[in-house]
Curated annotation (Swiss-Prot):
This is Maturase K. One of its GO terms (biological process) is RNA splicing. InterPro entries: Domain_X (IPR024937), Maturase_MatK (IPR002866), Maturase_MatK_N (IPR024942). Belongs to the intron maturase 2 family. MatK subfamily. Keywords: Chloroplast, mRNA processing, Plastid, RNA-binding, tRNA processing. Its main location: plastid. Usually encoded in the trnK tRNA gene intron. Probably assists in splicing its own and other chloroplast group II introns. GO terms for cellular component: chloroplast. GO terms for molecular function: RNA binding. It is found in: Plastid, Chloroplast. It comes from the Eukaryota. The keyword Ribonucleoprotein does not apply.
Amino acid sequence: MEKFEGYSEKHKSCQQYFVYPLLFQEYIYAFAHDYGLNDSEPVEIISCNNKKFSSLLVKRLITRMYQQNFWINSINHPNQDRLLDYKIGFYSEFYSQILPEGFSIVVEIPFSLRELSCPKEKEIPKFQNLRSIHSIFPFLEDKFLHLDSISHIEIPYPIHLEILVQLLQYRIQDVPSLHLLRFFLNYYSNWNSFITSMKSIFLFKKENKRLFRFLYNSYVSEYEFLLVFLRKQSSCLPLSSSGTFLERIIFSRKMEHIGIMYPSFFRKTIWFVMDPLMHYVRYQGKAILASKGTHFLNKKWKWYLINLWQYLFSFWTQPRRVHLNQLANSCFDFLGYLSGVPKSSLLVRNQMLENLFLIDTRMKKLDTIVPVTALIGYLSKAQFCTGSGHPISKPIWTDLSDWDILDRFGRICRNLFHYHSGSSKKQTLYRLKYILRLSCARTLARKHKSTVRTFMQRLGSAFLEEFFTEQELVFSLMFTKTSLFSFRGSHSERIWYFDIIRINDLVKPLN
């Protein structure tokens, strides 16, 4: 544990900055406003009653922050007219949004300076095509085939508010800024409780997206810091004072004896101990830790992580949040796919002169399946079909024009096919296309007070072309004799589209 503490202090030694005086600078809030406008996600900040950013209100905010009783009034009256000023409710909502956003800009400065001032151990190459979330799937196809075990980790959100502040205290040794952070957290949740209310988390995330992302990323960076430590120090954990590592010491002595008798075996095994081939992927509050080795060794890795997480965060890490499974016998839910690495047999016929040989080869392949049941459940929730998958009309869209209705249904269908184009079994996607296409026909028929059969006969092939993906249209142009009504495309080809940088709306709720 002393080695871990020394490594932790060395890692955080470059992050001592005093940033609280920057809160009294007007340009900080202008930066916050610009970041809000240029954000990749739509945000509702720096506005009050549909009013835009005002430098005059910022000056008034800074002037009131200089007053001695400013924070006293805010703490004594936290529920009157929103935040920060219970006497002038007209500006209170503006202040409650602009001050946390400005605070987020300020506390992010030390982390940016750390990247510039601290020496880099190794330059990491940048690849432009890795912006896509789908870039992870070719990585899984390349790496996971050679691994044995996989751990599903649920990053825990129930954590005491004071622990969040203490985590930042190691990086930002600025007492006024930490007190201000305590004030923000105290406003959205009871200080004597844990963050277990999803309602409080949703409210805080909705109104202060930038501050929420900063706190979450800080928490996750500390969470993942242990993985970096264990990865670099995997062969340097012989704590003689702990009984947990007694077996490792005996194991090392056995390795010395084996090294004398079998030098080649000794080098190979030591390489395995020093380089456990760990691969870590994090997504949407969950993480996957895959490694190579025996089940017993991976189980020990699991408990190393749990014990160190408990030591770092000072709370009980629930062991059930880390699920350890054999990669060949299990599947995992990952970014809208049910993925696994099953072993499949490949029969190869080989003929040499007059002899014929049949060779049965066992191969591993990354299998990605579309969770059709979950997608049908979400389509049912969006009122495109019933719970059993029977298509129904969408009455709320009957006020739109015909081509707007066609465009909306067609866009949803194309997005689903576009996102799940990497599936190894696409047959289930055509069931979703059937649901959306018939739901669209029922919606149009309901609008024109007609039957589905009559309306589809009137539209003809134009109605079907709206639901075709780009890949299918290319194939339909290449093979003109193929009927548009019976075309099904290839079920085995997998195409990873690298232009998707976020999960579409129909996939996001599934994770």
